[in-house]
């Protein structure tokens, strides 16, 4: 029993601490140890003598109502508040949330020789004055003379006139060659003016042969149209259209003759 009481008191001493023994001692009530009452069913043995124990202080008070709330003064022996050490702040650790700002903005609260977790501070370029910035930013304007401008305008107009003349001269030469060439189908009398829709051109030889066929027969059969088209190097449709137009022309001439004659 004495061993268990000694262990319990040692356990309580380790929890409470040795620095505030006086404070904790005043809080608890000192009382004599009373032997627990034996149950009624247990019979005393006459062979063994009764044991007497020395009185000792109770571990816990008789009632829980006497326990008071701990104060800050009583706990000062266990809890030690953190005190900022000024001799370590300049050389070892710097607040990490200020490091990104310290690279670009100079803070007055830091020592100039303090390290920022191995980061290198970028040196800002020297500040330029307004006059120097204005001189560097102003673009250089090239100088032009009136003579140079007039010469360039004259050259541009000459080039335009020359290109227009060349473009108009080429079709004129082509038209003259077409009119002088007798074998050209566009130069014959069937070809209409440029203002009207151009008809299918026929050569003189083709027109003479078609006129001969028309004198023999005003209406050609299908087989004869294919034969004439093969001889004159034309299509069957061209021969058919020419005969239709020739018949319309002949009817018109007959109406004019009948109208003139009384």
Swiss-Prot record:
Pfam families found in the cross-reference section: Homeodomain, Hox9_act
GO MF annotations, alphabetized: DNA-binding transcription factor activity; DNA-binding transcription factor activity, RNA polymerase II-specific; RNA polymerase II cis-regulatory region sequence-specific DNA binding
Record's keyword terms, sorted: Developmental protein, DNA-binding, Homeobox, Nucleus, Transcription, Transcription regulation
SUPFAM superfamilies, alphabetized: Homeodomain-like
Job of this protein: Sequence-specific transcription factor which is part of a developmental regulatory system that provides cells with specific positional identities on the anterior-posterior axis.
Protein name: Homeobox protein Hox-D9a
Cellular compartments per GO CC: nucleus
InterPro entries, per database record: Abd-B_homeobox_TF, HD, HD_metazoa, Homeobox_CS, Homeodomain-like_sf, Hox9_activation_N, HXA9/HXB9/HXC9
Region of interest (Disordered), residue spans: 107-187
Biased composition (Basic and acidic residues): 152-176
PROSITE patterns in UniProt: HOMEOBOX_1, HOMEOBOX_2
Residues passing through the membrane, by range: none
A GO biological process held by the record: anterior/posterior pattern specification
Polar residues bias (residue ranges): 177-186
Recorded superkingdom: Eukaryota
DNA-binding region: 195-254
Compartments where located: Nucleus
Family: Belongs to the Abd-B homeobox family.
